[in-house]
Amino acid sequence: MNPGAARTPALRILALGALLWPAARPWELTILHTNDVHSRLEQTSEDSSKCVNASRCVGGVARLATKVHQIRRAEPHVLLLDAGDQYQGTIWFTVYKGTEVAHFMNALGYDAMALGNHEFDNGVEGLIDPLLKEVNFPILSANIKAKGPLASKISGLYSPYKILTVGDEVVGIVGYTSKETPFLSNPGTNLVFEDEITALQPEVDKLKTLNVNKIIALGHSGFEVDKLIAQKVKGVDVVVGGHSNTFLYTGNPPSKEVPAGQYPFIVTSDDGRKVPVVQAYAFGKYLGYLKVEFDEKGNVVTSHGNPILLNSSIPEDPNIKADINKWRVKLDNYSTQELGKTIVYLDGTAQSCRFRECNMGNLICDAMINNNLRHPDEMSWNHVSMCILNGGGIRSPIDERNNGTITWENLAAVLPFGGTFDLVQLKGSTLKKAFEHSVHRYGQATGEFLQVGGIHVVYDISRNPGDRVVKLEVLCTQCRVPSYEPLRMDKVYKVILPSFLVSGGDGFQMIKDEKIKHDSGDQDINVVSGYISKMKVLYPAVEGRIQFSAGSHCCGSFSLIFLSVLAVIIILYQ
């Protein structure tokens, strides 16, 4: 008997079964996501400043609520996630200190949130109460570990991961936070921020042992780290990120943001999987919208979508809008108090102030120096002539088209952190190190790029990090007619700067370690508001304080940098 003939009926039965019982259809999940909202509860102008022309304004939680409700009604499996930095950025946070964040995130029905660095701006106590105690959804971070007496106090208020039931399936969400947070905010000494990848892997492994085969990494470390997590952490299927305010889009973008890549950005993991990575810019301007199909083993089959521009074509939810109006009453005193006027656009955007000289930086530095005009004598016109200011400390522009009016509310959006402008004495060699640090990772939109007053600096970005300052001149003080002279490495200079930098923030450890003398100064917002009131009408310009040499092949443009990167990627993969 031919053995093959005996197997033929069985094979036919199996083939028939395959036709009658086809493979299970992929399971589809819709991921809605926000990041870096920074207290933009109300709609804003297109550049995230105060709304001037309502027909052209964007975002706000009332408009976000409308779109989220529409999608939840239309689609069966939806998660609403936030990748951190809800705290800080407008008068809302200055007054309510996070209570507003918890209230409106609860109202929108968020499913999970990762901790961002700015959630620690009011210290751990300002995170615990109100946010951690008042939200009714999980707050996540796998790489933050508490120690000492704080460990028991904060236990159970945040988690490394959470398993969510979505329809008939379960989805694991694992959180992470920038390990640079101690340099960027005020988490104190009893929280340890571990390496993201090292901390995430064991938590993902735990989820796998619990038979969770669909895992989203939700976190706040920036696009470059997001991509590394997608590549290195085995078992992560999707990465939803924040911190770098990255705009990704497939097709023609709907507003002025230039995409840093397609949405989703696909990373090939070390074990050969295609992992979608997404962010949704910042300030509540967009709602990230990603549809992912999983097979029965939890593998990503397809992923597609795009951020949704929350413009005026989307109506504001009337119930949320009414709630906003109730909360707004407490802010009206700040909104109506006029400090002065501007007849030019005050450019405080990250696209400018983290890449090149911006006139908002010039205005703030001029105010800092003006606030320290004292002690003239026969030898010196003033005791200090220099200011440095981290570009990341400038958080919003001010639009001159609103009759040019500048209010406390406007200024609180520009300078929301509540620090002081301090006076330090530094050697010229320390200043040189600080300016090298300012551009050591130029092009990544990081906050350490310095705005200046009383200083002329020229960079050559084509040179290696640590050797990019080609010219550094400072305004003399011991002179009757101020002029610029070369920085002397061995001379001691007085410099006005934010208290954040004095304490080593944004990686300026050399200032913290090498300062010769330190005197605390006045509250930042009081310094600038006083200057505006004194000047009455403002028109700060871009004056050439910060320049890039021809060898840099760089003009400090955020858009051109991203276009250059995209061009390189296209060339490499042609």
UniProtKB/Swiss-Prot annotation:
Residues reported in the UniProt entry to bind Zn(2+) 1: 36, 38, 85
List residue numbers at the site (Transition state stabilizer).
Answer: 118, 121
* Ligand binding (Zn(2+) 2): 36, 85, 117, 220, 243
Classify the source by domain of life: Eukaryota
The protein's topology relative to the membrane is:
Lipid-anchor; GPI-anchor
Disulphide-bridged cysteine pairs: 51-57, 353-358, 365-387, 476-479
Where does this polypeptide localize?
Cell membrane
Query: Which residue(s) hold a covalent lipid per the annotation (GPI-anchor amidated serine)?
Result: 549
Q: Which Gene3D superfamilies match?
A: 3.60.21.10, 5'-Nucleotidase, C-terminal domain
Q: What is its EC number?
A: 3.1.3.35, 3.1.3.5, 3.1.3.89, 3.1.3.91
Among SUPFAM superfamilies, the record links this protein to: 5'-nucleotidase (syn. UDP-sugar hydrolase), C-terminal domain (SSF55816), Metallo-dependent phosphatases (SSF56300)
Principal place where this protein is found?
Answer: membrane
**Record-annotated residues binding AMP?**
354, 390, 395, 417, 500, 506
PANTHER family, per the entry: 5'-NUCLEOTIDASE, 5'-NUCLEOTIDASE-RELATED
Q: What is this protein's function per UniProt?
A: Catalyzes the hydrolysis of nucleotide monophosphates, releasing inorganic phosphate and the corresponding nucleoside, with AMP being the preferred substrate. Shows a preference for ribonucleotide monophosphates over their equivalent deoxyribose forms. Other substrates include IMP, UMP, GMP, CMP, dAMP, dCMP, dTMP, NAD and NMN.
What protein family is recorded?
A: Belongs to the 5'-nucleotidase family.
Subunit annotation = Homodimer.
- The identity of this protein, by name, is 5'-nucleotidase
> Where is the organism placed in the taxonomic lineage, from the top?
Eukaryota, Metazoa, Chordata, Craniata, Vertebrata
